[in-house]
C-alpha cells in the first residue's frame, strides 16, 4: 500500500502532499520535514530507494525522483515493488507534462485541483488504479469537460440574477 505521495521543491516547501492513512496535520508536517532532510542530504550518485522506518514505521520504504526544482516522493510498504513505484513516479510526471506542457513548480501551485485529479486517477486510497498516462489523461479531460458544463449551468433565472445586481 502506498502511504504517502509528496511533491516538494528543493527548499523543502511541500507543493503537494497526500497521506493515505489519517495523520494529524502536525505529524504530516513533521514527516514532510523529515523526508526533506533525508533527501537534501543525499548525494546525486546514490540509489533513489530508501528504508524509512524511522519516520513511517516498520516495513516503510521511500522512492524519489528529482526533476528540476522538484522532488517527487512515494512512501509505501513492503507489499509494493520498488521499481514499480519508481515507474509510477514516471507515469505521474509524464501525465503532468501532458496536462501542463512541461510541468513546473508553478503549475503545481496554481492548479492544485487538477493535480489532485491526476493523482486520484493514478492512486486512490493508497492503491494504484491506473498506470497508463493516456488513460489518466482521458479521465482528467472528461472531468474538465464535466466541470466546464456544470459551471455554465445557472440555477438562478436571468431575470432574478439581473434583479440581484441592482
Swiss-Prot record:
Coarse class of the protein's main subcellular location: cytoplasm
UniProt GO BP: Golgi to vacuole transport; intracellular protein transport
Subcellular location: Cytoplasm; Golgi apparatus; Cytoplasmic vesicle membrane
SUPFAM superfamilies membership: SNARE-like
InterPro entries per record: AP_complex_ssu (IPR016635), AP_mu_sigma_su (IPR022775), APS3 (IPR027155), Clathrin_sm-chain_CS (IPR000804), Longin-like_dom_sf (IPR011012)
Lineage of the species this protein comes from: Eukaryota, Viridiplantae, Streptophyta, Embryophyta, Tracheophyta
Protein name as catalogued: AP-3 complex subunit sigma
Alphabetically ordered keywords of this record: Cytoplasm, Cytoplasmic vesicle, Golgi apparatus, Membrane, Protein transport, Transport
Keyword Electron transport appears in the UniProt entry: no
